[in-house]
From Swiss-Prot:
Assigned protein family: Belongs to the AdoMet synthase family.
Entry binding sites for K(+): 43
Broad enzyme group: transferase
Organism expressing this protein natively: Brassica juncea
The record's free-text note on cofactor binding: Binds 2 divalent ions per subunit. The metal ions interact primarily with the substrate. Can utilize magnesium, manganese or cobalt (in vitro).
Protein name (record): S-adenosylmethionine synthase 1
Cofactors required: Mn(2+); Mg(2+); Co(2+); K(+)
UniProt function note: Catalyzes the formation of S-adenosylmethionine from methionine and ATP. The reaction comprises two steps that are both catalyzed by the same enzyme: formation of S-adenosylmethionine (AdoMet) and triphosphate, and subsequent hydrolysis of the triphosphate.
SUPFAM superfamilies in UniProt: S-adenosylmethionine synthetase
Subunit architecture: Homotetramer.
Binding site for Mg(2+): 9
Gene3D superfamilies associated with the record: 3.30.300.10
Database matches in InterPro entries: ADOMET_SYNTHASE_CS, S-AdoMet_synt_C, S-AdoMet_synt_central, S-AdoMet_synt_N, S-AdoMet_synthetase, S-AdoMet_synthetase_sfam
Length: 393
């Protein structure tokens, strides 16, 4: 059996880039909660002792940007300079302006267009991906890297590993077998964790705790063997972290947000963007499309692409590739996808209920992945029944 290795990485919520994603989405939630028609393009950057939110927002909502920044930093665990940022003492800069009137007239006609006539907020192409290798219909390498990162945060916050600090990165290499286009995981080849820690803990304690409290609960035993390699804090020291260690910026973790390097990516980030931005809503609808193709048994693996022009409601193109795993030809699956999903931005917003903010809805997406999550707020994860005729054996 010929196999190959594939690697996916993740970062947890205390990573500076992810901190910025979460602040941008917390701002989006606050705007949509009060005004579902808010037009939001919110960016965040951070470095030592400073967070800045900037961008274009048109909303009727009354939003305390500084409070959102401090609350988000605090909830992640940035409560002192020792851990990389102090939520209560850091400088918060705000530079928010209104959406460009040129964009507004072209996209939503200054709020006068009907939903079916709302144009895409920008040009671009987005990809959705699904694979039958996990119950989530997501790549195993990505799922494991992401869940290990989430577990790191869990054992930090519940006090199991008191030496942990907010920043951290994970990486998992999986050995795969290609079964006529479908991906079959064989074993976990390598696990890498680099996590921020306090001054008191030894490298031996770090390795022991990570294996016992983080890796064992997440990676199924069937994927681990005596050849699995563990790199646990290989640099030897990771005390300085968060914005104190590295600058952070919204939208720099787009592969972690999606499929861990599998499928494809059009390059657009998600966080801080309202649903007229097809970077986000377009990526959500094609995830639902690809997932539905696989969940309905039409293929074991699927990639769906959609593309747009600014101000134009109808997509320029829709593309489907099942990597040779389809039970019917890809052109027939494409026809079913186009008949079953409405790719116009205004209609995607309605069908996926993307104007509903509040309750940390979009904030939840900004750490540990936008896809493969079992949460009713992730409406794009709902499988749509597709009508098709299964070929007779």
């Amino acid at each position: 059996m010929e196999t190959f290795l594939f690697t996916s990485e993740s970062v947890n919520e205390g990573h500076p880039d992810k901190l910025c994603d979460q602040i941008s989405d917390a701002v989006l939630d606050a705007c949509l909660e009060q005004d579902p028609d808010s037009k939001v393009a919110c960016e965040t950057c951070t470095k030592t002792n400073m967070v800045m939110v900037f961008g274009e927002i048109t909303t009727k909502a009354t939003v305390d940007y500084e409070k959102i920044v401090r609350d988000t930093c605090r909830s992640i665990g940035f409560i002192s300079d020792d851990v990389g940022l102090d939520a209560d003492k850091c400088k918060v800069l705000v530079n928010i302006e209104q959406q460009s009137p040129d964009i507004a007239q072209g996209v939503h006609g200054h709020f006068t267009k009907r939903p079916e006539d709302i144009g895409a907020g920008d040009q671009g192409h987005m990809f959705g991906y699904a694979t039958d290798e996990t119950p989530e219909l997501m790549p195993l390498s990505h799922v494991l890297a992401t869940k290990i990162g989430a577990k790191l945060t869990e054992v930090r916050k519940n006090g199991t590993c008191r030496w942990l600090r907010p920043d951290g990165k994970t990486q998992v290499t999986v050995e795969y077998y290609n079964d006529n286009g479908a991906m079959v995981p064989v074993r976990v080849h390598t696990v890498l964790i680099s996590t921020q820690h306090d001054e008191t803990v030894t490298n031996e304690e770090i390795a022991r705790d990570l294996k016992e409290h983080v890796i064992k609960p997440i990676i199924p035993e069937k994927y681990l063997d005596d050849k699995t390699i563990f790199h646990l804090n290989p640099s030897g020291r990771f005390v300085i972290g968060g914005p104190d260690g590295d600058a952070g910026l919204t939208g720099r973790k787009i592969i972690i947000d999606t499929y861990g390097g599998w499928g494809a990516h059009g390059g657009g980030a998600f966080s801080g963007k309202d649903p007229t931005k097809v970077d986000r809503s377009g990526a959500y609808i094609v995830r639902q499309s690809a997932k539905s193709v696989v969940a309905n048994g039409m293929a074991r693996r699927a990639l769906v692409q959609v593309s747009y022009a600014i101000g134009v409601p109808e997509p320029f193109s829709v593309f489907v590739d099942t990597y040779g795993t389809g039970l019917i030809p890809d052109k027939e699956i494409l026809k079913i996808v186009k008949e079953s999903f409405d790719f116009r931005p205004g209609m995607m917003t309605i069908n996926l209920d993307l104007k509903r903010g509040g309750n940390g809805r979009f904030l939840k997406t900004a750490a540990y992945g936008h896809f493969g999550r079992d949460d009713p707020d992730f409406t794009w994860e709902v499988v749509k029944p597709l009508k098709w005729d299964k070929p007779q054996a």
